[in-house]
Amino acid sequence: MTDTIDPDLIERGRKMFAGDWHFIWASPSIETLPPMGSVEIAFAGRSNVGKSSLINALTGRNALARTSHTPGRTQELIFFEGPPNAGLRLVDMPGYGYAAASKAKVASWTSLIHHFLQGRATLARVYVLIDGRHGLKDVDLDILKTLDKAAVSYQIVLTKADQVKAAELAERVTATVAALAKHPAAFPEVLTTSSRTGAGMPELRAAMIRLLDERR
């Protein structure tokens, strides 16, 4: 709810994401990562959890990040950059947990993600997207352990909130917060969003503004 957040953060977030956001880089391997510069915020999640849709909703651009009905299609780290004065990049990470992917492909994705997480000094936070209809799964808990080990700050975002009854969503948030108590790198607040309705986007933008302020 936006009435619990500093209105200045909400407005600054709105302005920043109303600016020019564009694709700048795709990295299929650790050797092809772009030079470090701006603060980076990454989005991780199971295949088809809605990472690309969320990035599009954040920036108000329907086709900035490619969406796909084919799980596991995103096989690279995709970098987007905002207006010059924003000092921020968004990173769309490969989806995980797609059972039909080959073992070699899964190993390749896993290596790329692990090396990126452990060696990126400009990475301020990873938003781990969880399908709000289903909550945390074992494969999600595995990536949380990876983030804990890498000592990378992360926060859970429940997606597709418009497809869940309010009472059920509240229970899911409570259960997720309880689960995060076991994870030292986790930010203890859970966000809920809907890329279709735009719910939760002002709060997510404001959270990113707060992160940028902390980095300056």
Swiss-Prot record:
The keyword Transferase does not apply. Its cofactor is Mg(2+). Residues 37-214 form the EngB-type G domain. GO terms for cellular component: cytosol. GTP binds at residues 45-52, 72-76, 92-95, 159-162, 193-195. Keywords: Cell cycle, Cell division, GTP-binding, Magnesium, Metal-binding, Nucleotide-binding, Septation. GO terms for biological process: division septum assembly. It comes from the Bacteria. Mg(2+) binds at residues 52, 74. GO terms for molecular function: GTP binding; metal ion binding. Belongs to the TRAFAC class TrmE-Era-EngA-EngB-Septin-like GTPase superfamily. EngB GTPase family. Necessary for normal cell division and for the maintenance of normal septation. This is Probable GTP-binding protein EngB. The gene is engB.
